[in-house]
């Protein structure tokens, strides 16, 4: 049935991202947000959160993990280039994104272009402003934030797979930050745990990541993150131990963390 349905669909010739039209919407929203009269309306900020989230999603909206790669011919068109990486994964290069394929399934992707910088910051600001002006907008704002959170959560997962831990950390922290909105009762601690885990991996080459990892893992612990194998304490130990030369107390904390876990 799927094959028959696909046979009726004409493959796209290339990935189409109408960035000009999207930028026009963003620019219109910028003008409205800067207008004293219009910016006093909650609806302006709801729309602002929406159009900026749409811009965030657009380049990768046709992608999901485990998607049959054959469908990409119909949703994204013919890649401009194909190759194989050092792990034997097929790479499909599109104008806006590089797709990793394994066993004819989409395994991950790396977005190589953005429609506009600073989308995340505007989404956070617009959502908060809409609710500040009218709490009744929560019903409209929540689906928008849910979409953005899902985007960053998925970005974190596929970036971990590639692996591109720097991007993964940033994505997981942004997902957690979006959940700090008053719309949600609590941030899902897994986002801080995953960010801390990735930071612990990177700490050997850049000690700042040990510092960041400690911060993220502490937040996960404060939010009652738990797992049966005690991985939080394992990675927190490495973050403390990696900072042992900066402060002797970190060595003590490292030992205490092992005992606690």
Where are these regions (language model features)?
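Canonical positions in the second alpha-helix
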Residues: 130, 175, 220, 260-261
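Bacterial Sec-dependent N-terminal signal peptides
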Residues: 1-22
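Tandem amphipathic alpha-helical repeat scaffolds
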Residues: 196-198, 238
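Short coil/linker segments at helix-helix boundaries
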Residues: 39, 51-170, 179-189, 201-212, ...
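Karyopherin-beta/Importin-beta family HEAT-repeat alpha-solenoid scaffold
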Residues: 96, 235-236
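Alpha-solenoid helical repeat scaffolds
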Residues: 44-47, 142-143, 153-154, 186-194, ...
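Helix-capping and short linker residues that terminate individual alpha-solenoid repeat units
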Residues: 34, 135-136, 180-181, 221, ...
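Short N-terminal segments immediately surrounding and downstream of signal-peptide cleavage
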Residues: 16-34
């Amino acid at each position: 049935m799927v094959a028959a349905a696909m046979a009726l669909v004409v493959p796209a010739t290339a990935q189409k991202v109408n960035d000009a039209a999207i930028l026009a919407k963003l620019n219109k929203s910028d003008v409205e947000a800067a207008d004293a009269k219009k910016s006093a309306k909650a609806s302006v900020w709801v729309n602002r959160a929406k159009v900026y989230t749409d811009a965030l999603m657009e380049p990768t909206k046709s992608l999901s993990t485990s998607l049959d790669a054959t469908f990409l011919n119909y949703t994204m068109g013919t890649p401009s280039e194909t190759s194989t990486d050092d792990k034997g994964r097929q790479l499909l290069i599109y104008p806006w994104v590089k797709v990793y394929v394994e066993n004819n399934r989409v395994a991950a992707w790396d977005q190589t272009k953005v429609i506009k910088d600073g989308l995340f910051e505007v989404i956070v600001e617009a959502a908060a402003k809409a609710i500040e002006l009218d709490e009744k907008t929560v019903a409209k704002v929540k689906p928008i934030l849910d979409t953005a959170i899902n985007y960053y959560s998925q970005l974190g997962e596929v970036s971990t797979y590639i692996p591109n831990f720097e991007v993964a950390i940033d994505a997981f922290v942004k997902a957690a930050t979006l959940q700090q909105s008053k719309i949600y009762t609590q941030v899902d601690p897994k986002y801080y745990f995953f960010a801390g885990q990735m930071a612990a991996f990177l700490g050997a080459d850049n000690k700042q990541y040990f510092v960041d990892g400690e911060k993220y893992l502490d937040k996960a612990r404060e939010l009652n993150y738990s797992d049966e194998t005690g991985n939080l304490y394992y990675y927190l130990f490495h973050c403390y131990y990696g900072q042992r030369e900066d402060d002797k107390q970190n060595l003590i904390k490292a030992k205490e963390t092992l005992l606690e876990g």
